[in-house]
Amino acid sequence: MMKSRTRRLSLSTLFGALLGVSVAAAWLYYSHRNEAGHGDLHEILHEAVPLDANEREILELKEDAFAQRRREIETRLRAANGKLADAIAKNPAWSPEVEAATQEVERAAGDLQRATLVHVFEMRAGLKPEHRPAYDRVLIDALRRGSQ
């Protein structure tokens, strides 16, 4: 009787461990898959929207211009973060200097968000009308996933 009970307990423990490992593995797989998909919206859009050669050329020019604009704003954002760090290092309390540096960070971050949205709509305008619904679906789905 003791042998049977020990065996059932061992099998239950093994089953529980395997179930736990399976759940953890599935969670890791799906969370990383979604992060990768969410992180590269640009690639998803290109896969979802069937571009012709003319559209590709137009969009490539728009993408190059946006990449330059993004680099400029990101440089400002890094500089603003540096000023904020300096202000906090000088006086580790809320101060007029920290407030001013915080506002500079917020302006740069807001500029980056606006530039990104302008770029999204410029890209859409470069598509043929029949390709815009697919673009819109991917964009809206990505925004909704990001808000959850």
Swiss-Prot record:
Keyword terms: Cobalt, Coiled coil, Nickel, Periplasm, Plasmid, Signal
Localization per Swiss-Prot or TrEMBL: Periplasm
Recorded GO CC terms: periplasmic space
Principal subcellular localisation of the protein: periplasm
Segment forming the signal sequence: 1-26
A Pfam family hit: Metal_resist
Induction remarks: By nickel and cobalt.
Keyword Nuclease among record annotations: no
Periplasmic topology ranges: 28-148
Coiled coil (residue ranges): 54-117
Top-level lineage group: Bacteria
Gene3D superfamilies, A to Z: 1.20.120.1490
Role, per record: CnrH alone is able to activate cnr expression, while both CnrY and CrnR (CnrX) are needed for nickel induction of CnrH. Has been suggested to bind nickel.
Family: To A.xylosoxydans NccX.
Protein's name in the database: Nickel and cobalt resistance protein CnrR
Gene: cnrR
